[in-house]
Curated annotation (Swiss-Prot):
The modification Tyrosine amide is found at Y35, Y43. Residues 1-19 form the signal peptide. One of its GO terms (biological process) is positive regulation of egg-laying behavior. Keywords: Amidation, Cleavage on pair of basic residues, Neuropeptide, Secreted, Signal. The keyword Ribonucleoprotein does not apply. The lineage of its organism: Eukaryota, Metazoa, Ecdysozoa, Nematoda, Chromadorea. It comes from Caenorhabditis elegans. One of its GO terms (molecular function) is neuropeptide receptor binding. Residues 20-26, 47-89 form a propeptide. It comes from the Eukaryota. This is Luqin-like RYamide peptides lury-1. Disruption phenotype: Eggs are retained in the body as normal during starvation but the number of eggs laid during the initial refeeding period is reduced and satiety-induced suppression of pharyngeal pumping is slower than wild-type. GO terms for cellular component: extracellular region. The keyword Secreted applies. Expressed in the M1 and M2 pharyngeal neurons from where the LURY-1-1 and LURY-1-2 peptides are secreted.
Amino acid sequence: MLTRVPVLILAVIVMLALCQEPEKPEKRPALLSRYGRAVLPRYGKRSGNLMESSQNSLTEESSDVVCQLIDGKYICLPVDAVRFRPFFL
């Protein structure tokens, strides 16, 4: 009888511990630099997004391009490039 009581108490404590919901990780505030701007990870710089948007705008403006293979590299120029047309003839 004396050994059953501590075992039952231990079993109840273990069951209560297992039945509890897992805690959500705490959200920490964003790291701010001394100027109040968010510190970005090394490979997540905002300038990369600007470059992608500028490339998209370039492809929208000049959709027709002429490409030529020279020394294993493709050189592509817009069709409107009058000064480069003798190069492709």
